[in-house]
Structure formats: structure tokens, C-alpha cells
């Protein structure tokens, strides 16, 4: 009877932590910062042998940034999952949270986590995400650190305003002589830039919904919020960029991730649930010569801007496996790699890094009615698809343009409309569990792809009195190489180390006591080493092989003829 009550309590706790989202409100099934913390704590308490939850950083808004460790040992090869860096993309955090839940209760979880570790950061930007749950819902990007975006010596003084009273922030359009936008001929609710080469003249200005609260002629240019964590990492950082922060890692949230990766050499691969993608469309590496043909990554060649060609095959194959596993063959274009965590993990930290956009509107049914066929060269093909998908599947996801009584700009009537806040990035809560299954399956597959340095095959040959040749063949039984080519260049993470330890009275006649291997190819790739030792018969030496992210082994070798 006690067991029945215990199971019932667990079921009730799970229902409270993960509501179904069946009521139909946009926030149903999603967790604000407080409920996210509670859900993680409940999972950790129920699975204390497998799950540890720690606070990685605290945001300016005093909200925790958690890191979840799945698996009992830090020294095992690991995958790091990063989510929630872009505030409006709540779906990434929800998938990461449910991934924690699903990984610990999956069949074979204990066995997988005995040999591997998975780190998950569910929500890197908790401050920005909170506007999803507010009375006024708007896509905030920056954390709670105040910042003077428009450099007028005042912080956060021009926030969005809900002009039509619907509780969400969309866009404003207003006719203007200097307008750059026109209504689309096929779908008039959509706006596109006028093409002067086709004789088109702009009619409208497009602005974020709101008033000019600080009377400087700009609208919502200094909204509440400081640093966009998804733009505060070191690769391709833009100084003075929108919400990018004062300098790379100026935000506690991003700096904590950098410190975590730097101190965890066991992280072999990174999976980013965010706005950048290299799985639907793999990164295209190319040689980009600099001055005098100098390679990237040198003073003359400049910084790395493309994956190294030696890594391309691995990215292509992982992309193929991801698409086969998820059933996704196409998706939205990746966001630019400006200070983002995905490109940073690869270019700066030397890890194989993979990214997914998490969720996006599906393919809309073709509309072949008269006057509804899109042009062959469609400049707004993506927006058109999203609009038609919303009309069929989520009508509230697009707000039709309507005039706002009493709101004029330069004597012209203001209309409000466009895609609803959060609609393009977050599905209904009822879809989150099935969405998580796809991403969890990929993470499980990624763990299986990690490099695996097996205990070496050793042969000992007596070549003379008290003289022995030791030959060791090291094999990588994982799919991925022991280090990415970019990691060999950056020397991050640690390369496979081969160390021969000898004792008193023993002498190393040839071969190096310690050496590093740049990269051992995956899928059974090997590397051979030889030493000649002078030692007493039947004495022993010790061979240490491996790296924190590819596995470590220690072998005692007896020096006798074989």
C-alpha cells in the first residue's frame, strides 16, 4: 500500500511539474523561472543517484542559471546541452527540461550514464524569458541588467506599448514618404521591401509596436533589458551591437558557461538548442586564404570563419543522422553567428558543436487558387509559408492589421499587426513532449558517437638481454575522432596523451616518455607507438593512455618475452 501511495505521489508531482498545456493558452505547458527550478529539484530528488542540479550563475534579475549533471562521475566523456540563451525561444528551455526527465527514466539510462556524463543548461537567459509569462507579452532579448541602448544617458526609458490592448507586442505600419515597405500583392497582410529595380516605390515604415516615450523620434529603441546572452560569446562578437553587451562574456550567464567548459575537459561535444543550426544544413567548410595565401587562424590569415575541411565529413554525417532520426529535411535559415554559443564552442573551444532551431512552423499547404500562387522568385517565401501555416494551424499567431484610434505618426494613421510575439519560435504546450523525444533521441545518439579510446593492444618483444621492445596500438572505437581538427589547432580540449611510466633501475632507450596524439580517426582508427626499454626480466612498467573527453586507461605491462 505504501508503494502505491508513493507511485501516486510521483505521478502527481510529475503532473504538477509538467502540465499538459491542454487548456489552449499560449503559456500552458511552459515553465517560468520559479517553476523551472521546482521541476528540476523534483527530478533530482526522485533520481538522486543519477541527477545533480547546481546553480551555474545568477542573472541580474536574481534568477538562477542551472546546470544539470546526469551521471555519477565527472571524469567520464560528456556531452553538454545548452538551451535558452535567446530569451524569446522558450521551446529550447522546455525541450532541455523534458530531456532531463526523459533521459533518467529511459530504458538503459543507468548503463549509459555509468560510462558517460551529460550536462544540461536548460535556461541561460532566465530574465528575458520571463516576459513570455507577463501581462504584456513581448519578445525581450536582454537580461535585467540596465543598459543605455541609445546612448542618451538614460537607461531603459523607451519600452514597447500595447496600443491595441491585446496583451502582445507586434509591429506598427505607417505610411511615409521615406517608407521602404509595401503590402504583398498575393498575401496583403505580409509586408515586403519595395524593389526599386522593378519600379516599386516604398509606402510604409515598419516599427515595433509602441510610442516614442522619450521623445527622441525613435520607437522602443531603449527597451528594458541589458545583454542578450545569445550574442555575448567570444566568436565574432560585435562591439556596440544590439544587446551584445560591453564585451565578450560581460554577462555573468555567458561567462559562467565559458568557465564551465574551460574547467571540464571531459566535454567532447556540445549540442545547442538555439537560433543557429548546422544539422538541417551542415556547416560548409572551405579554405579561406588570407594575405599571401596564409591559412585561417594565423596573424596573416585572420580568424577562423569557416570549419576546417578535415572536420567537414563528420559534420555532414552527423547532419545526415540527425535528419534521419528526426524526419526533418528542411527548416528555417540559421541566425547569424554573432557572439553565439554554437560557433564559440567549435571555433574557440575546439569541440564538435551541433545546433538545432528546436521548432518552427511546418510546411504550409500549397495554395493554387487564382491570384494566390506565390511568385517563382519569392523574396518572402519563408514569411509567406509561416503566415499560411499560422492561418491554418494557429490563427492567433498572426494579428491582422488594424488601425489604432488616436495614434498618428507624422500625421498618418498607425496600424498594428503582424506575427504575434513568440508564435514563430514556440509550439503549443501540448506538442512539447513529442518534440522533446526527437531531440532526446539525437542526444542519446550523440553520446554513442563520442570518441572511445580503448585500452591499447600491447606486444612485448625481447630484443636482447634485459632489452625489450614494447609496441602499443591505440584504437578509437567511437564514431567521432579523438579531437576535431579545429581542436588540434587550438589545443582544446586536451589531446590523447600516451605516457610510459618506468621505475627505478629501468631505462627508456628509445621512444618518448610522454607524447600527445593530434587526432585518432573515429570508427576504428589506430595509432601505434614503440619504446625500447632496458629493465630486469619480469619487471613492470605502466602505460597511461587517453584524454578526459575520450576515455582513460591504465595498463600494467610485464617485461618478458612473449
Q: Regions from the language model: what does each represent?
A:
Residues 8-17:
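Bacterial N-terminal signal peptides
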Residues 23-61, 430, 434:
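Short glycine- and acidic-rich boundary segments immediately preceding or forming the N-terminal edge
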Residues 52, 64-65, 82, 94, ...:
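Metallocarboxypeptidase
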Residues 76-77, 90-94, 98-303:
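Active-site/substrate-binding loop(s) of hydrolase catalytic cores
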Residues 474-489:
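Short amphipathic, basic-aromatic surface patches that mediate peripheral association
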Residues 529-537:
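Short, hydrophobic beta-strand segments
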Residues 538-548:
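Short, aromatic- and glycine-rich surface loops/edge beta-strands on solvent-exposed regions
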Residues 551-561:
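Edge beta-strands of extracellular beta-sandwich domains
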Amino acid at each position: 500500500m505504501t508503494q502505491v501511495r508513493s507511485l501516486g505521489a510521483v505521478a502527481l508531482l510529475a503532473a504538477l511539474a509538467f502540465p499538459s498545456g491542454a487548456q489552449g493558452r499560449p503559456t500552458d505547458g511552459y515553465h517560468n523561472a520559479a517553476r523551472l527550478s521546482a521541476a528540476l529539484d523534483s527530478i533530482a530528488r526522485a533520481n538522486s543517484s543519477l541527477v545533480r542540479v547546481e546553480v551555474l550563475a545568477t542573472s541580474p534579475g536574481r534568477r538562477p542559471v542551472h546546470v544539470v549533471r546526469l551521471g555519477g562521475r565527472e571524469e567520464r566523456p560528456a556531452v553538454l546541452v545548452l538551451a535558452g540563451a535567446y530569451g524569446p525561444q522558450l521551446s529550447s528551455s522546455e525541450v532541455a527540461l523534458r530531456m532531463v526527465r526523459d533521459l533518467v527514466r529511459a530504458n538503459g539510462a543507468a548503463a549509459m550514464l555509468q560510462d558517460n556524463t551529460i550536462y544540461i543548461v536548460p535556461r541561460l537567459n532566465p530574465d528575458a524569458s520571463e516576459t513570455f509569462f507577463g501581462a504584456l507579452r513581448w519578445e525581450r532579448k536582454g537580461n535585467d541588467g540596465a543598459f543605455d541602448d541609445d546612448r542618451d544617458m538614460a537607461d531603459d526609458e523607451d519600452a514597447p506599448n500595447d496600443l491595441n490592448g491585446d496583451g502582445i507586442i507586434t509591429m506598427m505600419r505607417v505610411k511615409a514618404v521615406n517608407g521602404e515597405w509595401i503590402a504583398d500583392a498575393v498575401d496583403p497582410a505580409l509586408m515586403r521591401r519595395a524593389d526599386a529595380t522593378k519600379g516599386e516605390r516604398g509606402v510604409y515604415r515598419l516599427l515595433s509596436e509602441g510610442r516614442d516615450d522619450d521623445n527622441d523620434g525613435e520607437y522602443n529603441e531603449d527597451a528594458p533589458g541589458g545583454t542578450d546572452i545569445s550574442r555575448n560569446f567570444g566568436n565574432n562578437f560585435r562591439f556596440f551591437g544590439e544587446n551584445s553587451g560591453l564585451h565578450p562574456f560581460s554577462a555573468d550567464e555567458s561567462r559562467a558557461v565559458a568557465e564551465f567548459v574551460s574547467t571540464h575537459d571531459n566535454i567532447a561535444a556540445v549540442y545547442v538548442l538555439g537560433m543557429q543550426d548546422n544539422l538541417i544544413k551542415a556547416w560548409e567548410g572551405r579554405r579561406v586564404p588570407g594575405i599571401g595565401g596564409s591559412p585561417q587562424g594565423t596573424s596573416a590569415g585572420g580568424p577562423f570563419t569557416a570549419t576546417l575541411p578535415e572536420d567537414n565529413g563528420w559534420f555532414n554525417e552527423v547532419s545526415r543522422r540527425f535528419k534521419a532520426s528526426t524526419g526533418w529535411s528542411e527548416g528555417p535559415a540559421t541566425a547569424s553567428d554573432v557572439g553565439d554559443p554554437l560557433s564559440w564552442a567549435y571555433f574557440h573551444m575546439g569541440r564538435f558543436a551541433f545546433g538545432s532551431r528546436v521548432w518552427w512552423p511546418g510546411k504550409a499547404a500549397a495554395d493554387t487558387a487564382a491570384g494566390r500562387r506565390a511568385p517563382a522568385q519569392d523574396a518572402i517565401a519563408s514569411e509567406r509559408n509561416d503566415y499560411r501555416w499560422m492561418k491554418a494551424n494557429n490563427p492567433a499567431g498572426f494579428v491582422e492589421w488594424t488601425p489604432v484610434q488616436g495614434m498618428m505618426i507624422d500625421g498618418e494613421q498607425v496600424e498594428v499587426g503582424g506575427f504575434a510575439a513568440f508564435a514563430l519560435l514556440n509550439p503549443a504546450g501540448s506538442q512539447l513532449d513529442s518534440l522533446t523525444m526527437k531531440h532526446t533521441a539525437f542526444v542519446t545518439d550523440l553520446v554513442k558517437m563520442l570518441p572511445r579510446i580503448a585500452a591499447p593492444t600491447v606486444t612485448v618483444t625481447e630484443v636482447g638481454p634485459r632489452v625489450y621492445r614494447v609496441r602499443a596500438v591505440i584504437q578509437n572505437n567511437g564514431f567521432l575522432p579523438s579531437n576535431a581538427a579545429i581542436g588540434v589547432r587550438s589545443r582544446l580540449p586536451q589531446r590523447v596523451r600516451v605516457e610510459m611510466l618506468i621505475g627505478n633501475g629501468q631505462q627508456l632507450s628509445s621512444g618518448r616518455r610522454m607524447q600527445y596524439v593530434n587526432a585518432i580517426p573515429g570508427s576504428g582508427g589506430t595509432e601505434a607507438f614503440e619504446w625500447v626499454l632496458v629493465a630486469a626480466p619480469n619487471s613492470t612498467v605502466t602505460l597511461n593512455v587517453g584524454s578526459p573527453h575520450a576515455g582513460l586507461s591504465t595498463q600494467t605491462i610485464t617485461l618478458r618475452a612473449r
